[in-house]
Amino acid sequence: SVVVTSSTAGLYGYPNRAPYAAAKWAVIGLMKTLAMELGPFGIRANAICPGSVEGPRMEGVLEREAAAKGMTRDQVYDGYASGTALGRFVEADDIANMAVFLGSDAARLVSGQVIAVDGFTINPDPKV
């Protein structure tokens, strides 16, 4: 089984992040092509699209955006988190658990799929 990671940017696009979104759309296209080409050999291919992930990269985004907008880091965090139905960021374990599932026999007929692990993004570009 092949499991690739893309991003919710590959599903929705994001203003002011065209190169990043384009790269993530490309990952999804690659995965779908692999699913078609490798399927006859019994090899599945799927993509995981995480939303905003807790960690050092996102901390940098929050700090830079807070400074640019004259807000606190927590105000920016809350703005992003409120853009999901579940109201929180993704943790690394959320992504890992999906990857384990997709690589397991429990997902033996799951191929060519794009799975968002994002708490259901309802607003990909919250105005914070």
Question: Where are these predicted regions, by residue range?
Answer:
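Residue(s) in the substrate-gating loop at a strand-loop-helix junction
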Residues: 7
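Short C-terminal tail/terminal secondary-structure segment
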Residues: 12, 111-128
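Active-site loop immediately N-terminal to the catalytic Tyr-X3-Lys motif
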Residues: 12-18, 40-41, 87, 105
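Active-site helix of classical SDR
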Residues: 23, 31
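Short, flexible catalytic-loop segment of classical short-chain dehydrogenase/reductase
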Residues: 28, 50-60, 64, 68
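A short hydrophobic alpha-helix cap/turn motif
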Residues: 38-40, 53, 103
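Short, small/polar-rich loop/turn modules that mediate ligand/substrate recognition or access, typified
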Residues: 39, 44, 110-112
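C-terminal helical subdomain
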Residues: 47, 55, 71-106, 110, ...
